[in-house]
A protein has these predicted regions:
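A structural signal for small-residue-enriched, beta-sheet-centric alpha/beta enzyme cores
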Residues: 1-73, 77-90, 94-399
Length: 399
């Protein structure tokens, strides 16, 4: 949780409980945006797109005045729920739009939770109506808590940057512990900027931030049907950011930093995780190869269980590299763990020390360095280990 949370002018948040899956815990969030806001949204690549994702995409592509409110519920994904699922999400969006004096297309829904269960629409509608009466510019911590499912703690980052004579606030929060392989996981992310930025620049900023953050993490290799990320600029006229200006570049860097920190918080709170693992691929032939190898190693159950058991089983890492579809030969591959040499030229490194390797593997943060020696490109992926707790959490998730 951020030590100090900076409010974003014109953005208000309200939370309430639907009294469904999580009892009295607040699980419903409404966020209202100023009329001047610009919004960039990115959604799951999963072909099974949840009803709220489908409606969000449709609403954002309409020729209305743009997104002016977000409705987010936790506990029910409203995915694989057919026509009734779409009717349900449309019904509460329409009702809340009326209360906010907005067009239906101005309301953008997001959901996270169990797939394939009918949405208790009346419960969530009542929760959103209650949340609407509790709107406040200060409810950031409550908002970050309301969207959680299997997460054990909220993830929120807030920063201020000064550029020239102006100070810009940027605040964001996210959720996600399992079904994390963005391409975005059961992952929801909302980041807000106190500035006026045009939509094209905002979209570019968003895409670049995703590439080095949520699109560079994995817990279990599964991509949710509900993945959604929103980047909002509130349209503050006093803080106009010109395209390609120094201010835009600095804000973009800060946004990237916030996205990366949120992604790291997701990995630290991954389901059942005891370790945070960075897979760094260097000297790859191209970005495709670097990404492919990094994710192949990061998503290997054998590698992940070895990390959990603090087992310096370098053969599992080398084997994962060897099966990657972009690799022609492993003859030049080098592998290190926390700078301890494991593999050189595709075989055990002559400098290998079992004692040093074992000590390295016992650390809570592990860096696996893979040098392919096929080119000059590099890429990093963050992941977690695979423990018994992950299995327990996911074996009775619906209960």
């Amino acid at each position: 949780m951020a030590k100090k949370i900076h409010n974003i002018e014109g953005v208000q948040l309200g939370t309430a409980s639907s009294h469904t899956r999580y009892g009295d815990k607040e699980d419903s969030l409404i966020i209202t945006l100023p009329k001047t806001a610009q919004v960039s949204c990115k959604f799951t690549s999963n072909k099974l797109k949840a009803a709220p994702v489908q409606l969000a995409i449709n609403n954002l592509s309409s020729y209305s005045s743009g997104a002016k409110a977000f409705l987010i519920n936790a506990g029910n994904a409203n995915a694989a729920t057919g026509q009734q699922g779409m009717k349900n999400v449309k019904s509460y969006c329409k009702a809340i739009a009326s209360e906010l004096n907005l067009k239906e297309e101005n309301v953008i829904p997001f959901s996270t939770g169990v797939i394939g269960e009918a949405l208790p629409v009346n419960n969530y509608l009542s929760a959103f109506q209650e949340a609407n009466t509790k709107l406040s510019p200060k409810n950031w911590a409550k908002a970050a808590n309301a969207i959680l499912t299997t997460d054990t703690r909220p993830k929120i980052i807030s920063k201020k940057i000064t550029i020239g004579k102006q100070t810009f606030s940027i605040t964001g929060f996210a959720k996600g512990s399992g079904m994390i392989r963005p391409d975005f996981a059961t992952l929801l992310s909302f980041v807000f900027i106190d500035a006026k930025i045009n939509r094209r620049s905002l979209n570019k900023m968003h895409a670049e931030a995703l590439d080095c953050s949520f699109n560079a993490i994995t817990v279990d290799g599964d991509t949710s049907p509900n993945d959604s990320s929103a980047l909002v600029a509130n349209g503050n006229e006093a803080k106009l950011v010109e395209t390609n200006s120094k201010a835009e570049k600095k804000i973009a860097q800060c946004v990237k930093g916030i996205f990366k920190e949120l992604a790291e918080l997701l990995i630290e709170d991954a389901e059942g995780a005891t370790k945070k693992i960075k897979i760094s691929v260097n000297k790859a032939n191209n970005l495709q190869q670097a990404k492919s190898v990094a994710f192949t190693v990061a998503e290997s159950p054998l590698v992940k269980t070895a990390m959990f058991g603090s087992d310096a089983n370098w053969g599992r890492i080398l084997s994962a590299i060897g099966r990657d579809r972009t690799i022609d030969t492993i003859e030049n591959v080098q592998i290190k763990v926390n700078d301890v040499p494991l593999v050189k030229k595709g075989n055990i490194d002559p400098k290998y020390s079992e004692a040093k390797a074992s000590r390295a593997m016992k650390k809570k943060e592990i860096l696996i360095q893979i040098i392919l020696n096929t080119g000059k490109t590099e890429f990093e992926v963050l992941t977690s280990d695979l423990s018994e707790d992950y299995v327990l959490i996911n074996s009775d998730y619906r209960s």
